[in-house]
Amino acid sequence: MTILFVTMVISYFSCMRAAPMREIPGVQGGHRAEGYLGAAAAAAAAITSGSRGHGTPQSGGGLPWLTDTFEQVIEELLEVEGEATQQLGPGADQGQGGGGPAAMADSKDVDMYASRVMISNQVPLEPPLLFLLEEYKNYLDAANMSMRVRRHSDPARRGELSVCDSISQWVTALDKKTAIDMSGQTVTVLEKVPVTNGQLKQYFYETKCNPLGYTKEGCRGIDKRHYNSQCRTTQSYVRALTMDSKRKIGWRFIRIDTSCVCTLTIKRGR
């Protein structure tokens, strides 16, 4: 399982190698020069050496060490984003364009690694990194349980089912075309983002209710005698390169599908 997870992470980073993060003054030297790619590579090397030794990740430093490594990855991302904001200055335009897309692309490189947005030259092969880290954390929690507790905590063994069936997939600007920004205006989602060495595509990881699922007629497990239920797709804001009605190009927060929830109403007259 651990080897599979590392393979997924390496595959994920390979999708982003065409768009390296911009070097920020004062963030060079030491382990910061390597960045989170170096930390991930070190984790992969440790796991590989551990699996060759005794067949378990513990021989390469232990699963807790690996967890700390990926926590360091997230910390580095947050630190780099904060330093990038300082470099832009307090008067910099943070949300509604300005300065041209090419200039903004470099200053917003840190945003390429948001949880549900990626800028890449090919379709991402795996879910966003933060989703993989969450799944891996759940795996570590299960690994620390006894076999008996692990069996009883398995959702499949307990008969757990989702209230609403959902699907998640990467989509492009060609699929979205338009979106609603934070001011309620309809904007055009640009397919390509100018970068230093060319252009890359924007990808969005969307989650919505499955129209072919078993919950299209209502939520699972709800007493239909007393409640009306419906599975509905909800949205959240992410940052993307867009163009407004005045043909002004800039980075804006737009709404994309991010979850499928159950809504209930009480039946009247009961």
Swiss-Prot record:
Q: What does this protein do?
A: Promotes the survival of neuronal populations that are all located either in the central nervous system or directly connected to it.
The alphabetized UniProt keywords are: Cleavage on pair of basic residues, Disulfide bond, Glycoprotein, Growth factor, Secreted, Signal
Give the intrachain disulfide bonds.
Answer: C164-C231, C209-C260, C219-C262
From the UniProt record, list the residues forming the propeptide: 19-151
- Give the record's glycosylation annotations as residue positions: N144
Keyword Nucleotide-binding (UniProt) = no
Secretion signal: which residues?
1-18
List the protein's name: Neurotrophic factor BDNF precursor form
Chief site of localization: secreted
Pfam families according to UniProt: NGF
Q: Which GO terms describe its biological process?
A: cell surface receptor protein tyrosine kinase signaling pathway; modulation of chemical synaptic transmission; negative regulation of neuron apoptotic process; nerve development; nerve growth factor signaling pathway; neuron projection morphogenesis
Gene Ontology molecular functions: growth factor activity; nerve growth factor receptor binding
Q: Which SMART domains match?
A: NGF
Q: Does this UniProt record's set of keywords contain Signal?
A: yes
Q: Which GO terms describe its cellular component?
A: axon; dendrite; extracellular space; synaptic vesicle
Localization (cell): Secreted
UniProt lists the family membership as follows: Belongs to the NGF-beta family.
Coiled-coil intervals, chain numbering: none
